[in-house]
Regions:
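RNA pseudouridine synthases
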Residues: 1-249
Length: 249
């Protein structure tokens, strides 16, 4: 029998999703069969998998060690965990952290998320940092992996927000979607701009050519092909034909 206590960073997710991550090599039908037969229980009661987990919930799996090892993908998860633990998280510049959220300053040249498996991105540095400080155990890593909520281009430096818990991840993702968290950028442009400006226009992207077209106005029949966009900027400093701008997208 295996027993697990739900941690704060695992809470909030559906029981069946938790189990499918815990038993990553098992089929969904196997997981639901074990629930029906009470070979898997939640707080010593029968469960159907739709329950929302809370911190402190007790999960019991009445499975043999061989069966658990077969379906848990433990070797693969442990290998990934140890690889992350070996990463030097010293490059991570933490500017804010609480129980649910961590905010880092991503330097230019660092990927937000990896493009190929061998990349080490900001996401890996965050996971390494949490593992090294003891905030993410091997068992927790199998069922929930903290992740960044926003992305920046490789050559752009700035703040990245990551959810340490499912609640933190969902809350910040929703805040970014609803724009209750505002995004501001700093850039240097050629030319001397001295007034705050609010621009409105329309954007169309050619996916095949990977080109973007921006126009100030469109005809009614073109509405389906364009997205409305708005940009605000204010001059921060002007010098020798260049302007530093604060841009709100």
């Amino acid at each position: 029998m295996k027993q697990f206590t739900i941690s704060p960073n695992e809470s909030g997710q559906r029981f069946d999703k938790y189990l499918k991550k815990l038993l990553s090599n098992a089929s969904g039908s196997f997981v639901y069969k074990m629930l029906r037969k009470k070979n898997i229980t939640l707080n010593d009661h029968k469960a159907d998998g739709t329950e929302k987990l809370n911190a402190g919930d007790l999960v019991k799996l009445f499975l043999s060690d061989e069966t658990f090892e077969k379906f848990s993908g433990e070797d693969e998860a442990n290998s990934e965990y140890m690889k992350l633990k070996s990463i030097d998280s010293g490059r991570l510049q933490v500017v804010y952290e609480d129980d649910d959220v961590i905010i880092m300053n991503k330097p230019s040249g660092m990927l937000s998320q990896k493009a190929v498996p061998e990349d080490i991105s900001a996401n890996e540095y965050i996971l390494s940092y949490l593992i090294r400080k003891g905030s993410l155990s091997e068992d927790q890593f199998k069922t929930f992996k903290p992740s960044i909520c926003n992305r920046l281009d490789r050559n752009t430096s700035g703040l990245l927000i990551a959810g340490k818990t499912l609640n933190g991840l969902q809350t910040m993702a929703e805040a970014l979607k609803k724009r209750t968290v505002q995004k501001y950028y700093r850039c240097i442009v050629k030319g001397e701009l001295r007034e705050n400006t609010h621009l409105k226009g329309y954007l169309s992207k050619d996916e095949q050519k990977n080109k973007v077209k921006v126009v100030s106005r469109i005809r009614p029949e073109e509405k389906a092909d364009y997205l409305p966009i708005e940009t605000e900027y204010r001059p921060v400093a002007v010098s020798n034909g260049y302007t530093e701008l604060e841009v709100h997208l």
